[in-house]
């Protein structure tokens, strides 16, 4: 599954780039080409809502009925670098709260539990613009700064040492999504919805991958 997703991601990015390059020039005569206007470049800072969960591998598929999303926030900055009329590159850096919850009587902890990770994440996205819509795809890396696990109202810190029961500092993932830009009272409103798929196991002793859905809303002057 991971290899399939990686192949789809790479193919998608190559398609976005090749499509945008082909659209970035316009022929007006056999020997003259005129470069079309590129997408605008800008920086914006954000505080966004995020819903996160954990995937425990195919061997623990029975946990699906016990999983609950953990709500969190992301705080950071995004830079859109306009390359052509239909294409831009978007690196971002933000602080993010990840993790997931399990209901009581689950096969792993038996009690209701919440696992939280506090991380810095750096995605680099290829963005295709089609009218007021845009589509994102790209890789991301993250560094897990701190983590906690709450079981039956008892909270403990996660260990990031290379030991049984420990967790990993670094992880890699892929992000895909889409958005829409519209005007409200002379203000430009930018809505972006994104799915974040962890590709690397964050646990030293079991299968555990981060999954999240990120909703971003940005308002700027026209």
Label every model-predicted segment.
Residues 45-49, 73-83, 93-95, 122-130, ...:
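Residues on the lipid-exposed face of transmembrane beta-strands in outer-membrane beta-barrel proteins
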Residues 54-67, 97-118, 145-168, 203-205, ...:
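Flexible, solvent-exposed loop segments that connect beta-strands
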